[in-house]
């Protein structure tokens, strides 16, 4: 017959083609498949060639009444954050259009500063100016904490329901201004669009979660048991002025989460963003002020840590510090707080980690590879939870490395504003130089498995190519490597204890992962490894507020966990009130009980 035909003949190895064949048989054998319907005389040509996307849009949407909508998964406690459906072409086109039209941004402290404006440049292309920022000087830092100290009393006296309602209102404003926040995360912090949307959503979750927790904890004092004729009440109270110091890698979520917890507890806040992401911090504070939080309860203070941080921490009006960043900086803050004769003040510190994932021979390698790509290279590896080490059992190591390096070759490195980008830049030139110096050392001490190529579009940005090295032991890592560099270590069956010891020897305890389908192995690792967040058969990033409270132990932080039910307690102090109720002339409680019995 004069009909053109096409021969469909996949070529490859048995291990690749067999699962492909099975998938095709299942797809083509289904009643709804094109192959099945094309020989059905009852199927019209129009039905066979109809656009599947248009057909899908034409279906009536029916929701199971027992399954809550995503926005309602937390029930009456709080509303879930909303984002952007990045799989919807129309939503993507609208997001891209709005991102392209965002104006330059500018930031200055909430108090007067004599510092001149500084340009803020895009880490993806240092030739592009995003806006400008005025940093605070030492005198401005003193004015900021004085302002917060004056405003703290009035803020504390507001009912907890009112403070919580302002946080809820702020969350709504963050959702309304999601595009502006995402745009700053992309252009100022170098985050991909996917990561930027997640950053904003997490901030919204923090605002609503801490508002809900404040209502639960602070609504009324807790009455404690005791003898008749006596009443004992335990109540929680704010500490005073809190200083919050946030990192640049989560310029919305962590910055907002710290100050939201302090505020809803009744403290006033001096909020210092990371130097590199002051524009994003300014917009966050502007939105919270628009929600109704007073300017003297939340004081925005961008500046260099060595200048303003030193002043804030040493000031006797500072009642506590919430810090997220490097372990070295946390130690410096702790020493500065302890060096005064002021009352002992809490330091809430969430620091870094040398996070490892252990894979045994029973693991599903396809899942291991995908989870490793997410854990090690999302956000260019600039997450405190990111995976730094992959322990893989020797029996499957070659296959795992082959699959991993092949998958790394598919990573798109480039402008984070492009939706196809998987890996964006690191934050600045100093970070880039430090990572490349580490890579040079790893080439000498280990074996380079893969190094991505950077194209010309990356020439003017602070890009570090995703890399993987094989090393003989974890102890070759002397500090946290904060970027897209993965280290692979082989381990032999029967030597799991040595792996556990190697992880423990780092002193860190933030995140840890296990890939195994053997319950005994999972139980051994999860019960013996001391880490704040342990994940089994999934990636080790993306902790969800209220579901996976986040924070480490050892060198990884002080606790309590952010996004957990105990976090607000670190911003509060306890007071016990004991009243002798019999002092009014009789034991009314006892007399009431006797009357009831009669």
Language-model region placement:
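N-terminal Rossmann-like NAD(P)+-binding subdomain of aldehyde/semialdehyde dehydrogenases
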Residues: 30-230, 410, 427
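Rossmann-like NAD(P) dinucleotide-binding subdomain of oxidoreductase/dehydrogenase enzymes
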Residues: 186, 216-367, 398, 420, ...
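ALDH superfamily catalytic-core signature
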Residues: 287-293, 314, 320, 327-472, ...
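Conserved C-terminal structural/oligomerization subdomain of aldehyde/semialdehyde dehydrogenase
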Residues: 4-8, 22-45, 123-133, 140, ...
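Generic, well-ordered alpha-helical scaffold segments in large soluble proteins
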Residues: 24, 28, 147-154, 166-173, ...
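Hydrophobic alpha-helical scaffolding
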Residues: 7-15, 24, 81-88, 134, ...
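A glycine-rich phosphate-binding loop feature that marks nucleotide/adenosyl-phosphate handling sites
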Residues: 12-15, 22, 38-53, 170, ...
């Amino acid at each position: 017959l004069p009909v053109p035909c096409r021969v469909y003949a996949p070529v490859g190895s048995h291990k690749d083609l067999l699962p492909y064949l099975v998938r095709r048989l299942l797809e083509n054998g289904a009643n709804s498949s094109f192959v099945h319907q094309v020989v059905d005389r009852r199927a019209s040509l129009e039905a066979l060639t109809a656009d599947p996307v248009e057909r899908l849009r034409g279906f009536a949407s029916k929701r199971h009444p027992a399954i809550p909508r995503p926005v309602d998964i937390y029930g009456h406690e709080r509303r879930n954050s909303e984002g952007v459906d990045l799989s919807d072409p129309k939503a993507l086109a609208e997001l891209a259009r709005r991102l392209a039209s965002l104006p330059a941004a500018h930031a200055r402290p909430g108090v007067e500063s004599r510092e001149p404006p500084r340009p803020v440049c895009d880490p993806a292309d240092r030739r592009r100016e995003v806006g400008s920022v005025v940093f605070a000087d030492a005198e401005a830092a003193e004015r900021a904490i004085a302002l917060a100290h004056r405003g703290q009393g009035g803020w504390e006296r507001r009912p907890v329901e009112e403070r919580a309602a302002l946080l809820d209102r702020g969350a709504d404003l963050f959702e309304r201004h999601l595009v502006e926040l995402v745009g700053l995360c992309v252009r100022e912090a170098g985050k991909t669009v996917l990561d930027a949307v997640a950053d904003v959503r997490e901030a919204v979750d923090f605002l609503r979660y801490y508002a809900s927790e404040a209502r639960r904890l602070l609504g009324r004092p807790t009455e404690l048991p005791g003898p008749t004729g006596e009443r004992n009440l335990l109540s929680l109270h704010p500490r005073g002025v809190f200083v919050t110091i946030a990192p640049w890698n989560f310029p919305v979520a962590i910055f907002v989460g710290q100050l939201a917890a302090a505020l809803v507890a009744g403290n006033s806040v001096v909020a210092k963003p990371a130097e590199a992401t002051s524009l994003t911090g300014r917009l966050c504070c502007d939105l919270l002020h628009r929600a109704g939080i007073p300017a003297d309860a939340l004081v925005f203070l961008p500046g260099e840590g060595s200048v303003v941080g030193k002043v804030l921490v040493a000031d006797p009006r500072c009642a506590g510090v919430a810090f997220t960043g490097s372990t070295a900086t946390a130690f410096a803050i702790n020493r500065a707080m302890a060096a005064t004769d002021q009352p002992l003040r809490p330091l809430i510190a969430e620091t870094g980690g040398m996070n490892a994932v252990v894979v045994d021979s029973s693991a599903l390698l396809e899942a291991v590879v995908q989870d490793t790509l997410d854990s090690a290279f999302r956000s260019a590896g600039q997450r405190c939870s990111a995976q730094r080490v992959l322990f893989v059992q020797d029996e499957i190591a070659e296959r795992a490395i082959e699959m991993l390096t092949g998958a790394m070759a598919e990573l798109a490195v480039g402008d984070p504003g492009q939706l196809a980008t998987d890996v964006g830049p690191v934050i600045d030139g100093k970070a880039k130089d430090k990572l490349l110096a580490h890579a040079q050392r790893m080439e000498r001490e280990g074996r380079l498995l893969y190094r991505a190529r950077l194209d010309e579009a990356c020439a003017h940005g602070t890009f570090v190519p995703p890399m993987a090295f094989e090393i003989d032991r974890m102890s070759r890592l002397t500090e946290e490597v904060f970027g897209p560099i993965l280290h692979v270590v082989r381990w032999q069956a029967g030597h799991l204890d040595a792996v556990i010891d190697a992880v423990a020897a780092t002193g860190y305890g933030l995140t840890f992962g296990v890939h195994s389908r053997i319950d005994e192995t999972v139980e051994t690792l999860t019960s013996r490894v001391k880490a704040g967040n342990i994940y089994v058969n999934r990636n080790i990033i993306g902790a969800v507020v209220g579901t996976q409270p986040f924070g480490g132990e050892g060198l990884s932080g002080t606790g309590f966990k952010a996004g957990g039910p105990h976090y607000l307690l670190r911003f509060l102090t306890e007071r016990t009130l004991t009243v002798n109720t019999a002092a009014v002339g009789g034991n009314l409680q006892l007399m009431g009980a006797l009357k009831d019995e009669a």
